[in-house]
C-alpha cells in the first residue's frame, strides 16, 4: 500500500490540469452556489433543475445534463464538492467558502483561465525561443499562446491588457479586493512581525510630508486598514497611486496617478514616510523590478521606508511563483534576491519577515 502512494500522489497531481479546466464551467453555471442553496445531497438532474429555475425564462446557453454532471465530477475530483458512489453531489467546506467569499471564485477563475492557458504553453514558449530564460513581461507563455491561436494583436499586449480586452479585468479586480480568504489586516500583520510603524509616522509628521503612499494600491483596501488603525492620519496623509483609469475616487483617501513603467516617469511624491509595494514586484521581471526600486530610491528621504508585501519564497508558494513566471515573467523572491535587488537600486534591507504562509514583509532604506 505504502509503495503505491508516490504513484497515487503523482497521478492525482498531474491529472488535475484538465479538471481545473472545468472550474470556469462550474462558476459560469453557479454550481457551487446551487449546491449550497440546495442544502442536501443532490443528483445531477436536481442541480440542473435548480439552475433552470434560477435563470427563469433566460434559456440562452443552457447546459446539458452531461455537462453539469462532468463539471460536478471534476469538482469532486479537485475536492471542491463532495460526491457519493451513486454520483450524488453535496457542498463541503470548500464549496461553502467559495460561495461565502465571492472574491475566491474570481481568483479560481483567474488561475484556471489565464494561468492555466499560460502554463499549457510554457514549454512550447521555451522551445520557440531556444530556451532563453527568464521571460520578458511582453514575451511570456501567455502572449505566445495568443500568437499560436492566431491573435497577433493580443499577442503583443501585456497580460493585464489582454485580460481587459477579453472582458476579464473586472473579475480580476474583484479577486484582488478579497483574494482567496480574509486574513489579518496589514497593521495586524506588521504588529505580528513586531514591526513598529509609529516612529516612522511620527517622523513623517515632523517633516511635514505625506505619511504613506501605496503604489498600485487598487481601490485602497490596505490604506483604509491603516487609516482605521491610525485614526490620526487624514485623507491627505494616505495616498493611493493607481493607473487603473476605472478608479476615479477612493473615499477617505487621496488618489493620484503614477505610471512607473514610463521610462521618464519619476515618483512624484518625494520623501514620504512609507512607500508600499504590495504584490507589485512579483508581477515584474528582475530588471523591471530593479528599475521601479531605483525610481523609489531616488524619491526617498534617508528616513523614508519602503515596505514590500510579498509571499515568502518557499514550497507553500511555489505554485504562485510558477504562475507569476507564466503570466508576467515575474517571480517570488528569497532573502538573498531581495538584497541583490536592493543593492541595484541604492537601497539596503533593514527588516525582513518570511512566514511559512501568507504575506511576508521586507523593509528597505536608502544606503
Where are these regions (language model features)?
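Conserved adenosyl
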Residues: 101-308, 312-316, 349
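Short, solvent-exposed loop/helix junctions and linker helices
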Residues: 25, 283-286, 332
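C-terminal alpha-helical "lid/dimerization" subdomain adjacent to the S-adenosyl-L-methionine
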Residues: 305-345, 349-353
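An amphipathic alpha-helix signature
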Residues: 44-48, 281, 335
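A short, acidic, flexible beta-alpha connecting loop/helix-capping segment that sits on the rim
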Residues: 312, 353-361, 366
Amino acid at each position: 500500500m505504502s509503495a503505491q502512494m508516490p504513484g497515487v500522489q503523482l497521478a492525482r497531481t498531474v491529472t488535475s490540469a484538465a479538471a481545473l479546466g472545468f472550474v470556469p464551467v462550474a462558476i459560469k453555471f453557479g454550481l457551487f452556489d446551487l449546491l449550497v442553496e440546495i442544502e442536501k445531497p443532490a443528483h445531477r438532474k436536481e442541480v440542473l433543475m435548480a439552475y433552470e429555475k434560477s435563470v427563469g425564462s433566460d434559456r440562452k446557453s443552457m447546459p446539458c445534463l452531461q455537462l453539469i454532471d462532468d463539471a460536478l465530477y471534476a469538482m469532486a475530483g479537485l475536492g471542491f464538492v463532495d460526491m457519493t458512489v451513486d454520483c450524488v453531489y453535496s457542498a463541503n467546506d470548500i464549496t461553502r467558502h467559495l460561495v461565502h467569499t465571492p472574491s475566491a471564485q474570481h481568483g479560481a477563475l483567474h488561475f484556471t483561465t489565464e494561468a492555466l492557458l499560460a502554463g499549457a504553453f510554457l514549454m512550447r514558449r521555451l522551445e520557440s525561443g531556444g530556451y532563453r530564460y527568464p521571460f520578458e513581461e511582453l514575451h511570456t507563455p501567455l502572449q505566445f499562446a495568443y500568437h499560436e491561436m492566431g491573435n497577433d494583436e493580443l499577442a503583443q499586449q501585456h497580460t493585464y491588457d489582454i485580460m481587459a480586452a477579453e472582458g476579464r479585468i473586472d473579475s480580476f479586480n474583484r479577486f484582488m479586493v478579497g483574494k482567496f480568504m480574509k486574513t489579518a489586516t496589514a497593521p495586524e500583520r506588521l504588529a505580528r512581525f513586531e514591526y513598529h510603524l509609529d516612529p516612522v509616522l511620527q517622523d513623517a509628521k515632523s517633516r511635514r510630508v505625506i505619511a504613506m503612499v501605496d503604489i498600485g494600491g487598487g481601490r485602497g483596501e490596505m490604506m483604509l486598514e491603516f487609516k482605521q488603525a491610525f485614526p490620526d492620519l487624514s485623507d491627505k496623509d494616505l495616498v493611493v497611486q493607481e493607473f487603473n483609469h476605472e478608479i476615479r475616487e477612493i473615499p477617505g483617501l487621496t488618489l493620484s496617478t503614477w505610471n512607473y513603467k514610463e521610462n521618464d516617469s519619476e515618483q512624484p511624491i518625494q520623501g514620504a514616510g512609507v512607500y508600499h509595494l504590495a504584490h507589485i514586484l512579483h508581477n515584474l521581471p528582475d530588471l523591471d523590478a530593479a528599475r521601479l526600486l531605483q525610481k523609489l530610491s531616488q524619491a526617498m528621504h534617508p528616513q523614508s521606508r519602503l515596505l514590500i508585501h510579498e509571499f515568502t519564497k518557499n514550497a507553500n508558494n511555489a505554485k504562485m511563483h510558477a504562475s507569476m513566471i507564466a503570466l508576467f515573467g515575474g517571480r517570488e523572491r528569497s532573502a538573498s534576491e531581495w538584497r541583490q535587488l536592493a543593492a541595484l537600486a541604492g537601497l539596503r534591507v533593514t527588516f525582513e519577515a518570511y512566514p511559512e504562509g501568507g504575506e511576508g514583509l521586507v523593509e528597505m532604506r536608502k544606503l
